[in-house]
A protein has these predicted regions:
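Structural motif
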Residues: 1-3
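C-terminal catalytic domains of large/alpha subunits in multi-subunit enzymes
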Residues: 18-257
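Thiamine diphosphate
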Residues: 11-19
Length: 257
């Protein structure tokens, strides 16, 4: 159970991947419950590029705590000390003798014969906010007679630390770039002298379609952030920021020639 809301960024998948990695099990064995503020643990919210970095680290801490408890219970049932066992995601094994007890058997024993649940809950708050980095390069064509501009190609290189899920990261970058292109070339809120909004529907407020954004190419520059889960940083907002200055500079360069 997590407190972060998956609003289309795929955080349920990413956080499940982190949990599976920590517990050495398959991602499909992790069940992520949809957020319900009645029962979900507190979370500051899925905004400010915080979900992977902040909630992800909370997931890692929780799984490490749960893993420790699994080893303690397994050692108890095997009749040895917790420091004398190893957990491989499926079995707790006593290192000296090779005796084993399965994860499922530990769960059954806890459910039927124990007063203490096998559960863990942790929180994470970071005193630092390591920034991601991104380079954006735009190619445009301009009709100098009419002023009509066409975006031909956009190339982005992103440093978001360890890329937890390359497919989800790539589509999030592409979506953010499309938003940035809209901010640079199409979107505007217009008011009259009395303060009435003239762009209060999608008939007046133009957002780019797939035909308007040209070719978008995305690459990742790998790095490792020691304060993040598995070395990951954020990726949400940085991708919207670069299209405006990149396109502006491309227009200036093209106009000068």
């Amino acid at each position: 159970i997590i407190g972060a809301t998956d609003m289309g960024t795929g955080c349920d998948t990413i956080l499940a991947q982190m949990a599976a990695e920590c517990l050495e099990c398959k991602p499909e064995e992790i069940v992520v419950f949809g957020v319900d503020t009645d029962i979900s643990p507190y979370d500051c919210g899925s905004y400010a590029s915080s979900t992977t970095y902040v909630t992800g680290q909370a997931v890692v801490k929780t799984c490490e705590s749960l893993r420790k408890k699994i080893c303690e219970r397994g050692a108890e049932y095997l009749g040895c000390k917790p420091e004398d066992v190893d957990f491989d995601g499926e079995y707790v094994t006593e290192l000296a003798t090779g005796k084993q007890i399965s994860r499922s058997q530990i769960g059954n024993n806890v459910m039927c014969f124990s007063n203490a649940p096998l559960s863990a809950s942790e929180a994470f708050s970071s005193p630092v906010s390591p920034p991601p980095f991104m380079v954006g390069m735009a190619e445009v064509e301009i009709d100098k007679e009419t002023g009509v501009l066409e975006l031909i190609d956009y190339v982005a290189v992103v440093d978001c630390g360890t890329v937890i899920n390359p497919n989800l990261a790539r589509v999030q970058v592409e979506g953010g770039i499309a938003q940035g292109i809209g901010m640079a070339l199409y979107e505007d809120v217009v008011y009259n002298e009395k303060g009435k909004n003239f762009s209060n529907s999608l008939m007046q407020y133009k957002i780019p379609t797939r035909l308007d954004v040209g070719t978008i190419r995305v690459e990742f520059e790998s790095s490792y952030e020691p304060t993040g889960p598995f070395g990951a940083k954020s990726i949400g907002e940085i991708v919207i920021n670069t299209p405006s200055p990149a396109i502006s500079n491309a227009i200036r360069d093209r106009s000068d020639h």
